[in-house]
């Protein structure tokens, strides 16, 4: 039985009478006599022959195309024109109706919580402010899609091939601000608004920062950031001659202030601060500024006061609010440099206690990544002599360096793209086209928001920034793992080497294309982001599963969602080093937001464990940012509880379970259905099994944290390997030899396991000694060979060796 697919996707029985009726209307409209039954039936037979069917289903547009063609070929040209005119009129009516919002559905969908978008953003609670944001956002999104973007961009968004972020706001995305500029100028520059002179006291500055971030958040869609928070505040402590109690009171007012709902949707400003911990080299000799005036001392003279700021900040963040709930904002990012002092100090202990308990901070890896601490302040000062050079947007996952940021983000639905391609060649062709569309849409948005900036729609941004020339156009991606599953030329997830190689190839391909866009749209900047995809991962999968029932998602038996960016499936491994080895191939290739989240089931046992984990990662991996992310719960009566407890284990009252949703902590009950399913599927990392926390007794822990970082050398010299002051592990009959090569993440992971487990071993770098590799027939690294000739090959080599020599390892400890 022939069926018809209507424009809304519904399928109905075919009714030939409707074709006959439509044709008769066209004849009458032109005054042309309706043909007799014989002619009419012959025309209908020709129409049926022209209709394109698939699985006995015909598209409504195919029927109408066939009617037009038959009328014209039968000599009824005026009737055909009338039919085309009528068809276009109906199309215009449909489009006009589609552009008019169903206000009843919109409002009731929010009030009755029927629309999944009620939980689209976990920071927006069910409130009157949330309703107002929902209503205004729907209007603004229609404006972007109907009036600004071209039809292809709008249609690709509607089809979930791409996601245009922040359509609900006629504003740029995220920004990093120059805190020193605020210190020098105060809050002013906008006509008709109250102005404030530069702050002369720490308490005043803290209030100004709260006000400034709140003001700017209402002119931007995303995160607002300050850099060198502790460095710039320290001189105020010195000139005020504040004791610790006074410092803590000021910092407390700042933290509570930025957590007060003051932006659209009854949200707190989405804020990020970067803390230097030690005075940066490029600021050390600069004269400190207080009250807009240079002082007779430098920032480098204020290390003592800087420590007071850091101590106060961490203590308040660790104490949490009155019910033990961790503060959502600001998200702090700490700089881990080569000269970071890992010794047991009061502030180190506090920092890593906060990390172990709440997972609050992010850590910037300035040890092994391609970033430098000064980059956060130098972006706006660089001359772009090479248009193809890709810059990195510094400042943390949700932050940005001083006077830089992003004007917008467009994310590509990789699983849908792969699903619709028959071959790898077709994939590259369609990926290029999709990126072209994204780049053009971002170019359009930049022109729009720049015009609105000049028109005065963002008055404070105009006063403090002036232009968006140092702000990036950001292209993101989602569902790399499911892309590999749906790719007909792969068909395997990211735990397989073939898929990892393909993703690495894709990221490099995308980077090269971004360089092309920087030349084409010069002087605009482009970057590549591992999109957080809080709602996008769910929206993409939900849409795709409805449209393509056999497409593979991250969960085939529950609520569908896609894995964020190019992350491993959330339930893949409990070994943090397995995940790190894979992500170390991908994350350094992004030039915008990306982070490795170390998800833990509950708080780490002590601060030394957290410090050792962070140090191990930054010493041995190139990925730019890392977080330690324990799950915790909050009872209204008993406060903080380690781990996941939806009911308090003491009083059985309902408790809030907190975990990191994409980059920040929110109650799991506020997550959308897709992210809630991801939380259920998530396998947390067992750091004990990974070996990170072995020998964490008081003395051993202090030694592990207090030792300076071992510098990994490209020649992998044996002298740099044995970083142990305890008896090394040996095979029963001697020392094993590990054969590695340059730039091999699996080799690095194998060496790291040996170091942590105190294994004494030799290293041969096959990149420099191919003759030895050929002689021994070594075709894969890492390869570990015992003196008796036993071989352990591939990414599991170190684990296999440790298992085979378990008794020796136990004796050594």
Describe the function of each predicted region.
Residues 1, 774-785:
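Structural micro-motif
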Residues 1-105, 467, 652:
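Charged, amphipathic alpha-helical regulatory modules used
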Residues 69-72, 276-277, 462-483:
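Core structural elements
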Residues 92-93, 99-469, 490, 496-650, ...:
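Conserved catalytic cores of very large enzyme subunits
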Residues 646-712:
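Long insertion/accessory domains within large nucleic-acid-processing enzymes
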Residues 723-759:
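Local sequence-structure signature of Cys/Sec-based thiol-disulfide redox active-site neighborhoods
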Residues 740, 760-771:
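Thiol-based oxidoreductase modules, predominantly thioredoxin-like and allied folds used
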Residues 787-813:
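Non-catalytic, surface beta->alpha helical segment in thiol-disulfide oxidoreductase systems
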